[in-house]
């Protein structure tokens, strides 16, 4: 029997067709699977340039239905603030762009309308700085400003400017500021001499102008330092000091008058104890020749009686009223008798 031997390199048609169909079918299947995978996972068309996107539409609707197609994200959004649309045509701009242009124009016009100084490096006195920083007479800023500059948080704050101006003024004249503060302190605490009762109102530091030196305004013709005007009222209110001043002027000579006498506070001179001692003592030459400092010493001794009423003293601390006390600090010289709190608590126990 003759057997059929196919020639090598030339396969039969049945086997060749079946193998070719197998490879072609598998190749189409792999292409379909890869394209389907790319439609769901590829982020952009650039990821697979060789194969175009195939959109799978599962709906049975018309082919014109674009519900499954994605939106075109490459189109520029006209309402976006970052991108500005530039029209190629010669038509007018939209109203929003016109409003933006007019706003910029109004801002530039307002810059031109403001009165800036021609010489910015001009020397400005510190005293005129408060007038420059103070607000206008109307107290309102003109409404011609654009809405951005009309915002309240961006407006100039005049109080802050005035604080800075006052701080600069204090730095420029520290000596004058210190003298004025000391004069206000002496108003409250010190009593004037007799010659100050005839001083006019111009001697008060409040009436002195800024250009007038303060020392020349408070010194009299004889070179004596005059007291401020606030303490003159204390002399008018206290009759005791006026009577003692008249007595001392009649008896004592100004040349023999001691120069280092302690000034009496007007607050203490109007106290009840000082007037009671003056009324109770007889009008003798010895009482007239006493200086205010000696009256102050006696008054300290009598005022210590009511010291426990004025101060909040613990009941466990007590002292004898017969003991002497120092007139300067009003503190008892003798050691205080202090009860031990432990003993008090032991006595309170039942």
UniProtKB/Swiss-Prot annotation:
Keywords: Nucleus
Residue stretches of biased makeup (Basic residues): 287-298
Chief location bin: nucleus
UniProt-annotated location(s): Nucleus
One cellular component term from this protein's GO annotations in UniProt: site of double-strand break
Biased composition (Polar residues): 10-21, 246-259
Renumbered residue ranges of the record's region Disordered: 1-21, 237-266, 278-298
Identification of the protein by name: Uncharacterized protein C16C6.04
